[in-house]
Amino acid sequence: MRLKIENAMKELKETIPFRVRFSEVDSMNIVWHGSYPLYFEDAREAFGRKYGLGYYDIFDNGYYAPLVELTFKYKKPITYGMKPEITIIYRYTDSAKIVFDYEIKDSTNGELLAEGHSVQVFMDRNYQLVWANPEFYEEWKKRWQD
């Protein structure tokens, strides 16, 4: 029987502020839906830098981590000039994938504006799906156990 370590892992998250640019809004002055994946990408990159699970860390170990699932839900409009913040939260899984949840909040009052979820899988250098956790990823998870 394999022991789950989900509850034994530290909560890994990162929060970054961002400014809504004019090029990211539609004619109603509301953030265009296509901008949200970019905000999530910025959060994933910040998380990777902070915790040592960035794209180059993955590449340097001989793998790619393509995004295979991305969802988001709008709660309140985000408009031009706002300065929200996005929090990315790592979600442990035994599977060979990287799972994140996201929350975008108004930095002035903490109100939830949007939330999302993403899943990345591992592929080897021959673009073949990897079904077992790569060794470096298992080691990374162990590093963050309580």
Please state what every model-predicted region is:
Residues 2-67, 124-146:
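Hot-dog-fold acyl-thioester-processing enzymes
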Residues 72-107:
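Hydrophobic beta-sheet segments that form the core/acyl-binding groove
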Residues 114-116, 131:
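A structural microfeature
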Residues 12-14, 64-66, 82, 96, ...:
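Residue-level preference for beta-strand/loop junctions
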Residues 22, 102-104, 120:
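Generic short beta-strand
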Residues 108-110, 126:
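Solvent-exposed strand-loop boundary residues in beta-sheet-rich modules
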Residues 68-70, 103, 117:
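Short, well-ordered beta-strand segments in beta-rich or mixed alpha/beta enzyme
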